[in-house]
């Protein structure tokens, strides 16, 4: 087993499970992307302050621009440059990671979605780059899938994040509750936070359903693997709601039987090659100015806005 795949097996069990359904060449590129993201995450953890982190990230970008060695790119060795992430996408990812060092709770859903784009939506774009996908619409859907998965992560890790002094639930949704409130809530606060969690999970479903439209237009094996990963993540969110457990009851996981059933359903299902490629531009209202986002209105789509009232 390669070092890259071992990193994913250890830290990203859902993705590792789904990767078994990919062709070896494609899975190796995705392992490399995942390992790169983990290395950047380690750089954040190793930095003592914003000044040191800025220097570390400058070194990363400088090495990339000048095609020089940097240990962050160790896993990219042997992969042709045309399959690697673009510089502007790497920069957006670094911005997202840097925001975790000097964490500020998002004021509203718009700020949260920008964060989700930078730490996960751009990973969808990295995957597009690794497959040489040029279709702009497919990139819209890739962003949506990344955002959906990050929203699921946030909802699953409410307690763990609070223990680290971080809150990703927007201020205007949880009415200014603190980490202390989250870790030791009153009965009403517990209800309010669980309702906020479920509200975000329902929003994540909008992004999942959009992402699935793009998956249908990918090569069969790639589509199958990505759909398995996405549906496993989405199933975690649905299990959170259905179980009636609170965020204090511990992280929700899927067992092997649940993973197997979902995977087999997808393997046995045919791709819907006639799936629409009309993207709901309203999903990108908050990120419209960021790379590869949908920044023009699509008049053919008349779905109601997903924005909070």
Predicted features along the sequence, with ranges:
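Acidic, carboxylate-rich catalytic segments that either coordinate divalent cations
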Residues: 260-300
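Helix-hairpin-helix/helix-loop-helix acidic hairpins
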Residues: 106-141
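Active-site alpha-helical segments that house and flank conserved acidic catalytic motifs
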Residues: 28-46, 139-167
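Single conserved hydrophobic/aromatic residue that forms the stacking wall/gate
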Residues: 301-309
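An N-terminal structural lobe/cap that precedes and organizes the functional/catalytic core
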Residues: 6-52
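Glycine/small-residue-rich hydrophobic helix-like segments
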Residues: 188-239
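Divalent-cation-assisted or electrostatically stabilized phosphate/pyrophosphate-binding catalytic cores
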Residues: 51-62, 166-203, 254
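N-terminal, motif-rich segments that launch catalysis or mediate targeting to/interaction with membranes
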Residues: 43-107, 113
């Amino acid at each position: 087993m390669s070092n890259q795949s071992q990193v994913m097996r250890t830290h990203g069990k859902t993705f590792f499970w789904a990767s078994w359904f990919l062709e070896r060449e494609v899975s190796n590129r995705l392992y490399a992307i995942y390992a790169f993201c983990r290395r950047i995450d380690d750089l954040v953890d190793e930095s003592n302050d914003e000044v040191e982190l800025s220097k570390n990230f400058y070194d990363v970008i400088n090495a990339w621009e000048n095609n020089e060695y940097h240990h962050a790119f160790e896993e990219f060795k042997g992969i042709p440059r045309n399959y690697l992430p673009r510089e502007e996408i790497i920069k957006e990812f670094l911005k997202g990671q840097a925001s975790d060092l000097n964490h500020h709770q998002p004021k509203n859903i718009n700020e949260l979605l920008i964060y989700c784009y930078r730490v996960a939506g751009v990973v969808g774009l990295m995957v597009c780059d690794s497959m040489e996908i040029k279709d702009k619409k497919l990139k819209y859907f890739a962003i949506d899938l990344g955002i959906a998965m990050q929203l699921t992560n946030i909802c699953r890790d409410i307690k763990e994040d609070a223990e680290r002094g971080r809150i990703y639930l927007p201020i205007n949704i949880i009415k200014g509750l603190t980490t202390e409130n989250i870790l030791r809530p009153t009965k009403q606060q517990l209800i309010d936070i669980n309702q906020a969690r479920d509200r975000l999970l329902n929003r994540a479903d909008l992004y999942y359903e959009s992402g699935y439209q793009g998956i249908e237009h990918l090569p069969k094996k790639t589509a199958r693997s990505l759909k398995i990963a996405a549906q496993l993540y989405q199933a975690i969110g649905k299990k959170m709601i259905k179980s009636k457990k609170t965020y204090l009851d511990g992280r929700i996981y899927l067992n092997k039987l649940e993973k197997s059933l979902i995977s087999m359903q997808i393997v046995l299902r045919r791709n819907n090659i006639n799936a629409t490629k009309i993207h709901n531009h309203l999903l990108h209202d908050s990120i419209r100015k960021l790379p590869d986002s949908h920044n023009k209105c699509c008049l053919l789509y008349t779905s109601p806005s997903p924005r909070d009232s």
